[in-house]
Swiss-Prot record:
Homotetramer, a dimer of dimers. One homotetramer interacts with 1 SecA dimer. Gene3D superfamilies: SecB-like. Disulfide bonds: none annotated. Keywords: Chaperone, Cytoplasm, Protein transport, Translocation, Transport. CDD domains: Translocase_SecB. Belongs to the SecB family. This is Protein-export protein SecB. The keyword Oxidoreductase does not apply.
């Protein structure tokens, strides 16, 4: 049997997820029921994603919010539009503040994204469509792209 030394764990750098929650969720199915009969071809999906980071206190507590919008269209109809604001509260424990931006922009969103993805898939399925399975997102690449845009 192994034991865990909690004294060491308390001083180790780590990220604690204190909460995860839906802040806002909207699904529009504007052309139903006609749009549900016109599902013989794969719709065009326009997807946008944004990340908002809010410092919640002088300590290292942050809210990381994913804003995801997906619009599905075919030749005739706007099939659906789903908007989700999904957030998590993170505590960055014993982590140098210089590392906070990359952790909050890359690692924290990656931790909560699978939950947001599942919510969107469930909503679109409940609206009568195939579940929208958003491809995995490379938050590291998004962060580096954003940093290079700020430098230019």
């Amino acid at each position: 049997m192994s034991t865990i030394n909690t004294d060491t764990n308390e001083t180790m750098p780590h990220i604690s997820v204190n909460a995860q929650y839906i802040k806002d969720l909207s699904l529009e199915n504007p052309s139903a029921p006609s749009s549900l009969a016109a599902l013989d071809q794969r719709p065009q999906i326009d997807l946008s994603l944004d990340i908002n980071i809010t410092n919640l206190s002088e300590e290292s507590f942050y809210e990381v919010e994913l804003n995801i919008e997906a619009i599905a269209r075919n030749e005739k109809y706007k099939l659906f539009q789903v908007e989700l604001k999904y957030a998590g509260v993170f505590n960055l424990i014993n982590i140098d503040s210089e590392q906070h931006p990359v952790l909050l922009s890359v690692h924290c969103p990656a931790m909560i994204f699978p939950f947001a993805r599942k919510i969107i898939a469930s909503c679109t399925q409940d609206a009568g469509f195939q579940p929208l399975m958003i491809d995995p997102i490379d938050f590291g690449a998004l962060y580096h792209k954003k940093m290079s845009e700020h430098q230019n």
